[in-house]
A protein has these predicted regions:
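Helix-turn-helix/homeodomain-like alpha-helical modules used for DNA recognition
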Residues: 84-137, 393-448
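Short alpha-helical DNA-recognition segment
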Residues: 27-48, 332-357
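Amphipathic alpha-helical segments of tetratricopeptide repeats
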Residues: 66, 108-116, 151-167, 204-215, ...
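DNA major-groove recognition helix of helix-turn-helix/homeodomain DNA-binding modules
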Residues: 57-74, 366-384, 628-629
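Alpha-solenoid helical repeat architecture
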Residues: 76-89, 118-125, 161-181, 214-226, ...
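A short, Lys/Arg-rich alpha-helix, primarily the initiator
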Residues: 1-28, 303-335
Length: 629
């Protein structure tokens, strides 16, 4: 994408770009449309998605991306109210398993009754959930949950999206993590049936799959921990302690370097069961550290009454917006009545009644109508939008790597990777131009300390995709992921420049907008952490320490709802800082607050070590004496 483009081409449909990425990655791997689409949709339907002529449903689209090792979080998606409602109900089931089996079983049956028309991925999820329930109810697989019955149930889960003699074709199949989980359940059932050799063969097929298909670590982290749990069980039953250790350590390191806590607690508990006799001193020390991680995460989960051994869907919604909510917010931002908002120029797109139903979530607009309705507000349309205008998944991965480096405050590496990104993209595209300017502004701030210049650059970057922001009601603007990050950094610089009124104005704007976008999922949008850090700092400036502690504890609780927990260590440090400062203001509460700040500080230390967050590790070392002695 190195040639020049005109303004008309810059306004091209972003959904087409995502289709191009899908097609390019498919062709690069020499995969036919029929093979990629197998079990989900027809090859012809996939062709329409690749050409940008059709959109996709959230669940199906996620599986398509994951089958090629692509990370859905590199895209922003739009879904219907129905899709997000279904996601929420599946998430509620996940939170109940394995601790509350009766309630989980009731919710599963409710789901089946409520949604008689289900996608293959939904049906697969329900079968997997039922399998785990039966397994946990009868731990040895006997009685109602007899091993052969479990095997039949696991087979049904696999066949929802995988056709044919899949056991003989594993190497050539295109599989998403959710599909491989179903195969692992078949392996678990075979183990319970006494066929350990077959169970091991299936476990190894899944264990080796990500590397064989050249998946990046972030993609592999979605399945290797689950594979390790079965592999470690099999290995220890056969007395192979070292094999169990090696698989467990590899899976744990993958979670640590991906900043994830999904399936972390079961993995840590399994590591504790490994006999130490065959391990050397370094390996035993590693397991000792793993025990510290287990203690800390159990403490965190108890603090927020969060089910640490829950199951996960493998589908995140932090980057997914609801079509009706987006249209409603943009209409309110522009001050348009419903009667005016139904027009695309001179042409009426939908009736007022239809728009009301769309905004309320009763109806989802057609792909074409959604495009026409949203463009009147200056937004690019599409069910799926790449984080940058590129036809390269490699570029999107590089952008995500830079985002992780920013979160870890590795500014020299950010600068290096930014130059690499610059050589791979076309700066004429709005999102690319915005990303480059945003990263440059961060470096001006973090490396040069020039707050004023950085503020100007950030404000300019925000205007690239939100040029009419000053002309509408800002709190109703649909701040997309990068816009929220930029606006959050603007807020923090305004605070540092001593402009509290402007800081509070931006905080209220972003809090309102993100609350609307959260909708019925209950999951905060990506970049929520940027907002909460700025909010905490503002409350500290105002000496509202008790409110700041509550805000950081609320943020920590929300971070646990995501598979990734990258900023959890920073949230706990903020709790420690605010408790310490509050004790200075309220000496009568010092003893209780001292206990709070010491515990929060220690948790922050362990979390920073868990995630290899060197910046926070060193930051905390410098302050250890203050908080712990």
């Amino acid at each position: 994408m190195k040639e020049k483009y005109g303004s008309a081409e810059l306004r091209r449909d972003y959904n087409q770009v995502c289709g191009i990425i899908l097609r390019e990655e498919r062709q690069k791997r020499n995969i036919s449309r029929d093979n990629l689409a197998s079990g989900l949709l027809s090859g012809a339907a996939l062709g329409k998605i690749e050409s940008g002529k059709a959109g996709w449903r959230m669940l199906m689209g996620t599986i398509l991306l994951q089958r090629m090792g692509l990370i859905p979080e590199n895209f922003e998606m739009v879904a219907s109210s129905d899709e997000l409602e279904r996601w929420r109900k599946r998430e509620d089931i996940c939170l109940l398993i394995p601790d509350r089996p009766s309630e989980a079983e009731r919710r599963i049956q409710e789901y089946r009754r409520s949604y008689t028309m289900r996608e293959p991925g939904e049906e697969q999820f329900l079968f997997k959930a039922e399998f785990i329930l039966r397994l946990t109810e009868k731990g040895d697989g006997q009685g109602i949950g007899a091993a052969e019955d479990l095997l039949l149930l696991a087979g049904k889960a696999v066949s929802c999206t995988i056709a044919g003699d899949w056991e003989k074709e594993m190497e050539s199949l295109l599989l998403a993590p959710a599909e491989m989980e179903a195969i692992l359940l078949v392996g678990a059932a075979e183990m319970l049936c006494g066929r350990k050799s077959k169970a091991k063969s299936l476990q190894q097929a899944v264990w080796k799959y990500p590397e064989a298909h050249q998946w990046k670590d972030r993609a592999a982290a979605g399945i290797l921990p689950q594979a390790a749990l079965l592999g470690m069980t099999l290995a220890m039953e056969e007395g192979e302690s070292r094999l169990a250790y090696e698989q467990g350590r590899k899976a744990l390191e993958l979670l640590r370097r991906s900043f994830r806590h999904s399936y972390l607690l079961p993995l840590l508990k399994m590591l504790e069961k490994i006999p130490r006799q065959e391990l050397d001193e370094e390996e035993r020390a590693y397991l000792k550290q793993a025990e510290t991680f287990r203690d800390t995460f159990e403490r965190i989960y108890r603090q927020y009454d969060y089910p640490g051994e829950r199951i996960w869907q493998g589908i995140s919604v932090e980057n997914i917006g609801e079509a009706g909510v987006i249209l409603k917010m943009l209409r309110k931002f522009s001050g348009k009545s419903k009667a005016k908002a139904v027009y695309d120029g001179e042409d009426q797109v939908v009736t007022v009644r239809q728009l009301e139903k769309i905004e309320s979530g009763v109806h989802k607009p057609s792909f074409e109508n959604y495009q026409r309705l949203i463009r009147q507000y200056g937004k690019q349309a599409g069910w799926t939008t790449a984080m940058l205008e590129t036809d390269s998944a490699e570029v999107l991965e590089l952008r995500q790597e830079i985002a992780s480096l920013v979160a870890l405050c590795q500014w020299d590496q950010v600068k290096w990777e930014l130059e690499k990104l610059r050589r791979k993209v076309n700066p004429e595209y709005p999102r690319v131009k915005q990303e480059l300017l945003f990263l440059e502004a961060l470096l001006v701030w973090k490396k040069n300390g020039d707050l004023g210049k950085s503020l100007e650059m950030l404000q300019e970057a925000l205007k690239i995709t939100a040029p009419g922001l000053d002309g509408g009601d800002k709190k109703w603007w649909v701040y997309q992921r990068e816009e929220t990050i930029i606006a959050g950094n603007i807020t923090e610089i305004l605070r540092k420049l001593g402009r509290p009124e402007k800081t509070r104005e931006w905080l209220e704007i972003l809090q309102f907008s993100l609350k609307q976008q959260k909708g019925q999922t209950g999951i905060e949008r990506r970049a929520y952490d940027i907002l909460m850090e700025a909010y905490d700092n503002y409350l500290g400036d105002m000496k509202q320490f008790e409110q700041a502690i509550k805000a950081s504890e609320e943020a920590a609780c929300n971070y646990l709802k995501r598979p990734e927990a990258l900023v959890l260590d920073k949230a706990y440090y903020r709790i420690a800082w605010n408790a310490y400062e509050m004790a200075e203001e309220v000496p009568s509460q010092r003893n209780a607050l001292k206990q709070k700040w010491r515990e929060a500080f220690r948790i922050s230390e362990v979390l920073a070590a868990f995630m290899y967050d060197e910046y926070i590790i060193n930051f905390l070392k410098e302050r250890r004496k203050k908080y712990l002695f």
